């Protein structure tokens, strides 16, 4: 067993060896190294064919038409292209956007930028479960609403939003619907033929593909128009210029094909391991699961250990690679904005750890993780005066702390 144990699959996944092997065939002189846009010789044709195959594989993962797949540098770029692209193209129709407070920063910061440009954004507050009721979205809709952007699976707490119902509502009101599917593509069955989604962001490195590659699904029926953010050679139907990174695209395609083929088996294994981890630690006193228990992605477990400081817990869990929120915001010592939006106080938000399990996690690793967590929580609480006061029956909320 290799230490530290990797339990941060929501931050990134290792590239599947089968994917890496496919990518290696697109790099060197004796491989498919040509520019897919070179139409005058075999090297270009081979690369174009490899890209076409990968585009089909990504399309099949979500049951889309391959012409609806636009390759980008990742889900962050896809989110930017979708939200800014719609806002700028349809600005004459309206300037109101609806999203939620628990979205990824790639969506929230893009919306903040649009606010600086004169757009109006409504940020919905989810229920304590992390779920956003369709009625809440409907109540926020206005005559000038042009876009709703809601993620399918939350990156910190793993809750699954009902994008089918939200899609139906948006379609009935003729409002464009964007879904950030970075955490769900390749892990949940997605069918854009039945789910009324207009735009969907997908990430390669969240499903055992390489980093630096993603895709944006752009619906053709109804046809969604976007204003491009990257101008140049008119690649990707003019939506995203730039020479296509054949090796990364091929990697993402292969990762999508494997994810589709192995999804059921993978998910069953991962769900079993996640339940094993939770059942191993849920009897620890003052331990709470964050987010809806039922409507949750199978690899995700976000737990608050009351009276333990999150950063000190992560240092105590040095044998476990885990995080206290999303990787993109983990450098800040602020408590998770996602957990704060669920109504957790600063202390509980600070004492939370995100465990995310994936394809290469083993039973042995989960057993070791359970023992490590139990031991670390015990040690840290022994040192905590707050824990001692709590055990003595003192109501900590009513204590008047002296300010120095």
From Swiss-Prot:
UniProt record similarity statement: Belongs to the class-V pyridoxal-phosphate-dependent aminotransferase family. NifS/IscS subfamily.
Cofactor(s) listed: pyridoxal 5'-phosphate
EC number(s) stated in the UniProt entry for this protein: 2.8.1.7
Subunit structure: Homodimer. Forms a heterotetramer with IscU, interacts with other sulfur acceptors.
Stored NCBIfam families: IscS (TIGR02006), PRK14012.1 (NF010611)
Keywords from the named record: 2Fe-2S, Cytoplasm, Iron, Iron-sulfur, Metal-binding, Pyridoxal phosphate, Transferase
Biochemical pathway: Cofactor biosynthesis; iron-sulfur cluster biosynthesis
Keyword hit for Metal-binding: yes
UniProt binding sites for pyridoxal 5'-phosphate: 75-76, 155, 183, 203-205, 243
Residues bound to [2Fe-2S] cluster: 328
Spans traversing the lipid bilayer: none
Lineage: Bacteria, Pseudomonadati, Pseudomonadota, Gammaproteobacteria, Alteromonadales
GO molecular function, a single term: 2 iron, 2 sulfur cluster binding
Pfam families cross-referenced by the UniProt entry: Aminotran_5
Recorded name of the encoding gene: iscS
Cellular compartments annotated: Cytoplasm
GO cellular component, one term: L-cysteine desulfurase complex
Function: Master enzyme that delivers sulfur to a number of partners involved in Fe-S cluster assembly, tRNA modification or cofactor biosynthesis. Catalyzes the removal of elemental sulfur atoms from cysteine to produce alanine. Functions as a sulfur delivery protein for Fe-S cluster synthesis onto IscU, an Fe-S scaffold assembly protein, as well as other S acceptor proteins.
Catalytic activity line of the entry: (sulfur carrier)-H + L-cysteine = (sulfur carrier)-SH + L-alanine
Entry's Gene Ontology BP terms: [2Fe-2S] cluster assembly
Domain of life of the native organism: Bacteria
Originating species: Shewanella pealeana (strain ATCC 700345 / ANG-SQ1)
Protein name according to UniProt: Cysteine desulfurase IscS
Protein's UniProt keywords contain Iron: yes
Residues where N6-(pyridoxal phosphate)lysine is found: 206
Active-site residues annotated for this sequence: 328
């Amino acid at each position: 067993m290799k230490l530290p144990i990797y339990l941060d699959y929501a931050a990134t996944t290792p590239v599947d060896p089968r994917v890496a092997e496919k990518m290696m065939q697109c790099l060197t002189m004796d491989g498919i190294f040509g520019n897919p846009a070179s139409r005058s010789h075999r090297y270009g044709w081979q690369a174009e064919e490899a890209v076409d195959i990968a585009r089909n594989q990504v399309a099949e993962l979500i049951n889309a038409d391959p012409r609806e797949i636009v390759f980008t540098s990742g889900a962050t770029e896809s989110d930017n292209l979708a939200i800014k692209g719609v806002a700028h193209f349809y600005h004459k129709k309206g300037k109101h956007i609806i999203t939620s407070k628990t979205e990824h920063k790639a969506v929230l910061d893009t919306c903040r930028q649009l606010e600086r440009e004169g757009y109006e954004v409504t940020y919905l507050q989810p229920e304590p479960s992390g779920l956003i009721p369709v009625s809440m979205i409907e109540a926020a809709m206005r005559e000038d609403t042009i876009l709703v952007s809601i993620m399918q699976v939350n990156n910190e707490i793993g809750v699954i939003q009902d994008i089918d119902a939200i899609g139906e509502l948006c379609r009935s009101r003729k409002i464009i619907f964007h879904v950030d599917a970075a955490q769900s593509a390749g892990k949940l069955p997605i069918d854009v033929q039945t789910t009324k989604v207009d735009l969907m962001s997908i990430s390669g490195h969240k499903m055992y593909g390489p980093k630096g590659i993603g895709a944006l699904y752009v619906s053709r029926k109804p046809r969604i128009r976007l204003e491009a953010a990257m101008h140049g050679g008119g690649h990707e139907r003019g939506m995203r210029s730039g020479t296509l990174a054949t090796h990364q695209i091929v990697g993402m395609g292969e990762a999508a094909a494997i994810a589709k083929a192995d999804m059921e088996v993978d998910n069953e294994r991962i769900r079993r391991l996640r339940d094993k981890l939770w059942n191993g630690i849920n009897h620890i006193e003052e331990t709470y699961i964050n987010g809806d228990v039922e409507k949750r992605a199978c690899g995700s477990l976000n737990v608050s250990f009351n009276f333990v400081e999150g950063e000190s817990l992560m240092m105590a869990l040095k044998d476990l690679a885990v995080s206290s929120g999303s990787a993109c915001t983990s450098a800040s010592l602020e408590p998770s904005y996602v957990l704060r939006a669920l109504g957790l106080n600063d202390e509980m938000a600070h004492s939370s750890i995100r465990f995310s399990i994936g394809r290469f996690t083993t039973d042995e690793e989960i057993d070791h993780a359970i023992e490590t967590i139990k031991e670390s929580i015990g040690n840290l609480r022994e040192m905590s005066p707050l824990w001692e006061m709590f055990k003595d029956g003192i109501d900590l909320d009513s204590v008047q702390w002296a300010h120095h």
